[in-house]
Amino acid sequence: MSIPFSNTHYRIPQGFGNLLEGLTREILREQPDNIPAFAAAYFESLLEKREKTNFDPAEWGSKVEDRFYNNHAFEEQEPPEKSDPKQEESQIPGKEEEASVTILDSSEEDKEKEEVAAVKIQAAFRGHVAREEVKKMKTDSLQNEEKEENK
């Protein structure tokens, strides 16, 4: 006898979701034939890395997730600090120059990344269109052969 509509919620251990996300990402990236064996090898390699470097990705992920959901820094708005106008004037030009340089550098990098991504997307779409045309040509040729056989 089963209960079709249950309000039971299971608590997932902290970091477990991050481990499964990492495994899923690697499975999608590698496309293995034997997923359980791949998962075992993946978790074993994570254990080896944890022993060698004393870095636990599950623990790190749980801390990041906890910080994300429990960060109360932006709930209260602080008034801007008042300082001497002379100090502000001397500090602003240097900061503006640095900020503009980093913005330009990042925008150039972003443009390059966008161009590479656009080329990949266009190539994938062209490949898709070409495959559809080949599929259509095959079905047309099969239909023509069937018509010739029926005559």
From Swiss-Prot:
Keywords: Membrane. It is a peripheral membrane protein. Residues 68-98 have a biased composition (Basic and acidic residues). GO terms for cellular component: membrane. It is found in: Membrane. GO terms for molecular function: calmodulin binding. Its main location: membrane. Residues 68-115, 130-151 are annotated as: Disordered. The keyword Membrane applies. Sperm surface zona pellucida binding protein. Helps to bind spermatozoa to the zona pellucida with high affinity. Might function in binding zona pellucida and carbohydrates. This is Sperm surface protein Sp17.
